[in-house]
Amino acid sequence: MIKSEEASDRSVMTMDQLGGYYHDPRAHPPFSHPHAHSHPHQHTHTGHPYRAGNLLTGGNYQAMGGGESPTELIDEKPNIGYMELKHYMDATPTATPVSAAQHYSLSALHSMGTPPASSSPIPPYGVLMTAHSAGSASPQSNSKTPTDLPQDLQYASSSTSTAKVQPLQVQLQPLNHQYASTIKYCSNNTILSANDYQLLTSQEQAGQQQPQQLPAQQLQHSPGGGYMSRISTSPSQVISNAHGMPVLNYSSSSSSPAKSLNGSESSPPSQNHLENKVSGSAVVGTGGSSQQDAPSTPDTTKKSGTRRPEKPALSYINMIGHAIKESPTGKLTLSEIYAYLQKSYEFFRGPYVGWKNSVRHNLSLNECFKKLPKGMGVGKPGKGNYWTIDENSAHLFEDEGSLRRRPRGYRSKIKVKPYAGHANGYYASGYGDAGMDNGNYYASPAFASYDYSAAGATGVSPAGGQGFADPWNAHAAHSGSSSVGVGMGVGPLPQYTNISCLAAGGNVNGSATTPPLAHSALGMAPSASSSSSPLGAAATLQSDYAPTASLVAAGYSYATSAGSLDNGLRSISLQQLPGLSSIQHAQAQAQAQAHHHHHQHHASHPSHSHQGHGSMHQNHGTSSTTPPPSQSGGSHGIDHSPIDRKPAYLPPISPPPMMVALNGGGGYYEGLKYAN
């Protein structure tokens, strides 16, 4: 005989092909079942511990089916030993090895017992010790075990604790062997995890297969009449196996009734089998004596299959008001109001009575309803109260629509953004955002959210990592993370984090033929262009905006040097500029038409470079005063692009005059603003 562990490897194969293991009773002396059952118990519990990894290997241990043939699981060492579960399966060559990968059927699970270290990626622990459990489950444990099976059932040992429980017809379904094991022991109710899952899924399969296999399978699976659980009362309940985790398939009491669900799902025959499995899991905990068949049946009590009538469109206040107004006396008792509502609306006629609470709630909390004590009758004062409409509120009930109940979710539906402008982030945040106190009025919320000064200090804006996640950075998507790359040195431009990149970007355009949109990828290496050193510093400014800046710079012919500008312009194609704002597109178009204005712009934009970068900008662009591209004569295409004229505060940069900022941030500011 071979210890279950090794068996698991072969077993898994064996099981599948043989359709079940033949468990030699001799192998498990404890198992009394002689396999006298109509179909020999092919104890799927091969005793091979769950494959080393507790994998439910694809082995499909199918006890089902019946491989009446004695399948031998050949496992060298039954780690099952945890449970005393060392079952040695007769290694019968008959079993044809099934690929280990094949699913371990549930039965395999129980047999998983302790997984040898070998095959399974998953550690041995949590192995289902049930190897003998199939056989081992004591008849008693399965209350339903057929009498013929019980003798077999005696859980042999017990430590195995009916791990046998699942003959695992379920095994049919390929369980993720790796995951199954993992699942198994991940949950202390392990079975629930892998086994349950298998059971459930396999049950469905089994449910179809079982009816045929079931007779044999049940018997073979469980001495207890094919009850999967076949769970012996043995405390070990396989689950105890390595972890003491209730990994055991359904063996452990921990196995939750959910498993039993499986049973219930399976076809009636399989149901027994499954129930036992399930109950086994439940039972195991209880020594198997208390099989929980009930849990095995899914709870369907709440599902009547019919929906309640639609709730009236009127509010409770309105309906109560109608009732009172239509009464001859103008007042009604609570019970009369109930009667009116039931008569008038189908919704109130069903079994649901929660609406009565709503009626009482509305009567007592709304000032429009007034409570009148019942007058003195012949004898004592009347019991209860009348409800009437307060004269001061009568007008509320004259307009039918005023109290009409709005459909659920109505308010949320009307809470839509007033205009899409915000989406673009152009003006969304309002110029006075707290985030913009440094004078960067890029209305977009994106800017508002950044701490520019902090960003400047680091040379990377806080959002740098985000790389233009902001609404205004449409091209952010292109940029990847902040491509701050533009050769960005660490020149922090505290307030123009977004802009600093532009300067670098300008370099990129000038020096690199790379399309501006490549900016993110570029990392602006091109920033090395003639002005690159200063630009690099600028680029360093706000790494987070680098991509945008680079795009803008690239997209615009803002390259610091005119020559580089032209190159950059050429490199840029409109297709490449989609990420750029319309301005950028316009510029791109204009580029072909008028690079000159771009040069001007670039000059201006360089001027915008942050403090200390001004020098670099100065190179080309003392012309920073040049109007932003939108204004430049050559930039006819640019005109249409929206430009936020709001002045942006530029730290005193020697080259850039404030006017540039006013103009739109010297072109590249604009680009940034409208990047999206």
UniProtKB/Swiss-Prot annotation:
Residue stretches spanning the membrane: none
Segments of skewed composition (Basic residues): 34-48, 594-611
InterPro entries linked to this entry: Fork_head_dom, Forkhead_box_regulator, TF_fork_head_CS_2, WH-like_DNA-bd_sf, WH_DNA-bd_sf
GO cellular component: nucleus
SMART domains: FH
Positions with biased composition (Polar residues): 133-160, 257-273
Keyword field contains Transcription regulation: yes
Comp. bias (Low complexity): 203-220, 583-593, 612-625
Pfam families cross-referenced by the UniProt entry: Forkhead
Ranges in coiled-coil conformation: none
Keyword rRNA-binding: no
Subcellular location: Nucleus
UniProt region (Disordered), positions on chain: 22-50, 131-160, 203-232, 249-312, 583-651
GO molecular function: DNA-binding transcription factor activity, RNA polymerase II-specific; RNA polymerase II cis-regulatory region sequence-specific DNA binding; sequence-specific DNA binding; transcription cis-regulatory region binding
Amino acid composition bias (Basic and acidic residues), ranges on this chain: 637-647
Keyword terms of this UniProt record: Developmental protein, DNA-binding, Nucleus, Transcription, Transcription regulation
DNA-binding region boundaries: 311-408
Single biological process term from Gene Ontology: positive regulation of transcription by RNA polymerase II
Tissue specificity field: In embryo, expressed in all types of visceral muscles and their progenitors (at protein level). In late stage 10 embryo, expressed in the caudal visceral mesoderm and trunk and hindgut visceral mesoderm progenitors.
Assembly information from the UniProt record: Binds to DNA.
Chain's role: Component of a regulatory network controlling visceral mesoderm development and midgut morphogenesis. Transcriptional regulator involved in the activation of a large number of genes in the visceral mesoderm including betaTub60D, dpp and Hand. Binds to and regulates a number of enhancers driving expression in the visceral mesoderm in a temporally and spatially restricted manner. Also to binds to enhancers cooperatively with activators, such as bap or HLH54F, to coregulate expression of shared target genes in the visceral mesoderm.
Protein name: Forkhead box protein biniou
Species assigned in the record: Drosophila melanogaster
